[in-house]
From Swiss-Prot:
It comes from the Viruses. GO terms for cellular component: host cell nucleolus. This is Non-structural protein NS-S. GO terms for biological process: symbiont-mediated suppression of host gene expression; viral process. Keywords: Host gene expression shutoff by virus, Host nucleus, Host-virus interaction.
Length: 91
């Protein structure tokens, strides 16, 4: 996927999903934490740009990853969150 001058590509290595972000001559690989339980390729839920920051949401079978890319600082943050709560409450 190409977005605002960045090439975004999902790959699976050693049983874990990685997001490869290429910006010009710079490339960074971001490990999607706990993605070993996600066999299918995570889907792009949304990608937005706010000022100079790009925000991506990837959704797997039981987890989602919020990825914030700061191209001017060459910094990428990745937050892993459960997709939904499946527990039960005592009544």
């Amino acid at each position: 996927m190409y977005h605002n001058g960045m090439q975004l590509h999902l790959t699976r290595r050693s049983g874990m999903w990685h997001l490869l972000v290429s910006m010009g001559n710079n490339s960074t690989s971001v490990l999607l934490e706990s993605s070993s339980s996600t066999r299918r390729r995570p889907r792009w839920s949304y990608i937005r740009r706010h000022n100079q920051v790009s925000i991506l949401l990837l959704v797997g079978s039981n987890l989602q990853w919020l990825i914030t890319i700061f191209p001017n600082m060459s910094q990428i943050l990745c937050q892993t969150m459960p997709l939904h709560f499946t527990g039960c409450q005592d009544i």
